[in-house]
Amino acid sequence: MQVTVETLEGLERRLNITVPAANIEDAVTAELRNIAKNRRFDGFRKGKVPMKMVAKMYGKAVRQDVMGEVMQRHFIEAIVKEKINPAGAPTFAPVENNEGADLVFNATFEVYPEVELKGLENITVEKPAVEVKEADVEEMIETLRKQQATWTEVEAAADAGSRATIDFVGSIDGEEFEGGKAENFPLEMGAGRMIPGFEDGIVGKTAGMEFEIEVNFPEDYHAENLKGKAAKFSIKLNKVEARELPELNEEFVSKFGAAEGVEGLKAEVRKNMERELKQAVKNRIKEQAIDGLVNENNIDVPSALIDQEIGVLRQQAAQRFGGNTEAADQLPRELFEEQAKRRVVVGLLLGEVIKTEELKADDEKVKAIIEEMATAYEDPTEVIAYYEQNEQMMNNMRNVALEEQAIDAIIAKAQVSDKEVSFNELMNQQPA
């Protein structure tokens, strides 16, 4: 076998491979003999059919099958010989494919980029300095009360804390637009569900009133045809309701299964908030470390890997929205391309960190991750046992631990400082 390697554009490579004719003919002959030996032919005893007849009947198809197998096998031998690491499946193209002559073909594919990590010392990470304060717990308790609140119809004017039930019809330049009409729509005032100015036009109005308001859709509104447009809404206020919060007593506490009364509920709420806070701090640090890693290391990305990741994201999107996963390929590629490329880049860079630092999943870290996750469940010991008895789940956790160790390795070389933030600031912070 003769092999030459061509470097094409970017990460694309082409192998030019020559396979001796004897290899092809020997493989074709062997397969034809196998057919002659094992298949029945009318007028002949099994295994006694003339080879010329078998070759005439099956020779073309057998040669095609042999060529495909030979190209695949010799491609693998070639990449091992040349120490090449393909990032996706090759495209084969025969160049010379005449019976009795050497087979000459090429295989075109992409390779993984050569990654040399740099700039880790330039990465800046602001570690959130935050704790759950008593006021945070009280605010969370108040949120729980609001979730259990009842609404009572009142004759008062609508204000920021009330719920208004309205009919409305929206129009732009006198024309109604899709999605701009509703009847008996319950609107919790102050929740910020509507576009800016909409709720303001309802404040101070009482049930039975009919009126119009004029607002502008934001420039970043999700519907392209409404971005930045001036709109008029005709509104009828059907009902105004006031929120009635439940008493913070034993009856209220019992709804959450907390022991030891109100103080027990507060303790349970604090415990949950501290667990969520710990994860949020970890996520914020990880996000900054990865952003810095990506910004400092610009690498080429194999399109084959991006295509694979787009396929994964399409399937996840279809499952998340209860759609037909078989139709996932119909979802527009543009929806996922940027995220897919980012995932591939991050995966390649973290993989290089793991390789460079010679990291292996730490068993104690794996155990700690599982135990911490199990605290969110009613019976942590049962969850831990489930993971320990499931090898696939354990492998997933080893990968999680390995990624965390890679992040730790980045942080160890980065510029890290503390930044004081409140619980709400951190929890409401949107990922970059």
Curated annotation (Swiss-Prot):
Gene Ontology biological process terms, A to Z: 'de novo' cotranslational protein folding; cell division; chaperone-mediated protein folding; protein transport; protein unfolding
Location of the protein in the cell: Cytoplasm
Annotated catalysed reactions: [protein]-peptidylproline (omega=180) = [protein]-peptidylproline (omega=0)
The enzyme's E.C. designation: 5.2.1.8
GO cellular component: cytoplasm
Molecular function, one GO term: ribosome binding
Domain PPIase FKBP-type: 161-246
Free-text function comment from the UniProt entry: Involved in protein export. Acts as a chaperone by maintaining the newly synthesized protein in an open conformation. Functions as a peptidyl-prolyl cis-trans isomerase.
Protein name: Trigger factor
Organism: Vibrio atlanticus (strain LGP32) (Vibrio splendidus (strain Mel32))
Originating gene: tig
